[in-house]
Amino acid sequence: MSDLGRVVVLAGGLSHERDVSLRSGRRVAEALRGVGVEVDVLDADSGLLPGLALDRPAAVFPLLHGAQGEDGAVRGVLELLRLPYVGATPAASRTAFDKPVARALVAAVGLAVPEGVVLPHSTFRELGAATLLDAIVARIGLPLVVKPARGGSALGCAVVRDPVDLPAAMVSCFAYGEDALVEGYVTGTEVAVSVVDTGSGPVALPAVEIVPDGGMYDYEARYTAGETEFFVPARLDPAATSAVADVAVRAHRVLGLRDVSRTDLIVDEAGRPWFLEANVAPGMTETSLLPQSVVAAGLDLGVLARDLLHLAVARSADVGGPAGPAG
């Protein structure tokens, strides 16, 4: 058995991405058990906090996706309980989860981002949808990508190639949040680059190239086996391979992330990477991207997860340690 002690994987929750989170949690828990770690999977429901306070684990691996999970809320609670946990701080999580804020920060250090505009639902309703959407098309051009300003798993996302489809795409997007981010569509190769840091600084894992059968890497394409073809490492030339790794590590640093992250990019025909978003709780399901990168790097998911938990415990000790014994 591991000397780590009992750990908890947090999964589930109440967001639209609950099912994905549960699948991620089961996958990581299985991997940890495979390397001798005692692990419980806990759902983030109303009984979570009393349970954590009463039976304190040595550390927590949060795998909650979407609101409350990736927006820093639950991580803030873990800090209040003085429980060591894997991943970004509450503040950094909020920054990465808010796509417009993350875009602005990475653009400020010279990373390429698609042209975009944030449109609140209230503005969409009150100022007239037709006029606003016409102005967006005139400014950015077609095709457009419509996505919730906060959220993941491509829920509420759409590629709009015909302006007549834009109103419906906006309505669908607003079902997942108050603000929509409308971006110019970048033609190229879609890749995801995972970054891990087990104590020696952030390192990019091999990039995953994503080729969905239906043309868009939507929720179904992400989590249904056989719906998407993946190439690991991505079929990029050496210069582009180096460039996407550099962008992912720089984004990880600029956004203040730690331990693990995943950056989604498009590499255009000239080999230039365009930043789309960064994720503080990358999916860990059987079709998710980070586990594929881990295998391609010659690593073991259980060993990596265990090392990240050890790092969280050491970090906690450096700042005063947990309140009370770990059970």
Protein language model regions, located:
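ATP-binding N-terminal substructure of ATP-dependent carboxylate-amine bond-forming enzymes
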Residues: 1-104, 108, 120-134, 307, ...
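Active-site nucleotide/adenylate-binding loops and adjacent lid/helix of ATP-dependent enzymes
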Residues: 1-11, 54, 95-189
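Hydrophobic beta-strand scaffold residues
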Residues: 39, 84-85, 113, 144, ...
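A short glycine-rich, hydrophobically flanked beta-strand micro-motif that places a catalytic Asp/Glu
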Residues: 40-45, 184, 192, 256-270
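Short, flexible, mixed-charge acidic loops at enzyme active sites
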Residues: 73-80, 217-224, 280
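ATP-dependent carboxylate activation and anion-phosphoryl transfer catalytic cores
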Residues: 110, 237-327
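Phosphate-binding site of ATP-dependent enzymes
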Residues: 158-246, 267, 272-274
